[in-house]
Structure formats: structure tokens, C-alpha cells
Amino acid sequence: MYAVFQSGGKQHRVSEGQTIRLEKLDIATGETVEFDQVLMVANGDDIKIGAPVVEGVKIKAEVVAHGRGEKIKIVKFRRRKHSRKQQGHRQWFTDVKITGIA
């Protein structure tokens, strides 16, 4: 059984027991979270596709960890001007473990 849900402007395909990385959620580590923006649920040959969401289906997950991703360097360089600008960015993320699809 698997499902597709939306979180943080992105769509994720998950199954029970899977750990995924999402955009940062303001929920403490160890807490549970429910996602109700379920776009599709498949159980064998039984497939339900929402328009836009499947009614009555929720995905339950447990927050495992919070952190920051790898650093991305942004460089702006102007040739022959002796001008250079550097900037870095590290995106916050939340790791969640899917505990149930109901």
C-alpha cells in the first residue's frame, strides 16, 4: 500500500514504515503529525485518485529529527570589474517516519 500526499508545496510517494525528508515543520521531535492532503491511495489494484484530495484518508507520521541540508553556494562574478559576491544557503528540513495510512 502506498499513497501520494502534498506537504511544503511538494508531492511525496510514501508507504508505511518509510522515512522521508520534508520541508521544515514546526512540530517537536517525537510528536506525531497527520497529513490530510492525500492526492492518491493505492492498495494493490484498488487505486483512489482525489479531485483534488481523497476524502477521509489521512497519513500519520512521527517526527524523527530536524536539521539543515548541505550548503549551497551562490556566486555572482563580474568579469574585468574586480567584483565578486558570494553567499551561502542551508535549507531547514524535518525527517518523518510514516506510521500509518488510514
From Swiss-Prot:
Family label: Belongs to the bacterial ribosomal protein bL21 family.
Function in brief: This protein binds to 23S rRNA in the presence of protein L20.
GO molecular function: rRNA binding; structural constituent of ribosome
Keywords: Ribonucleoprotein, Ribosomal protein, RNA-binding, rRNA-binding
Organism: Photorhabdus laumondii subsp. laumondii (strain DSM 15139 / CIP 105565 / TT01)
Superkingdom of this protein's organism: Bacteria
InterPro entries named in the record: bL21-like, bL21-like_sf, Ribosomal_bL21, Ribosomal_bL21_CS
Gene (name only): rplU
SUPFAM superfamilies to which the protein is assigned, alphabetical: L21p-like (SSF141091)
Protein name in the entry: Large ribosomal subunit protein bL21
Subunit structure: Part of the 50S ribosomal subunit. Contacts protein L20.
GO biological process, any: translation
GO cellular component, one term: ribonucleoprotein complex
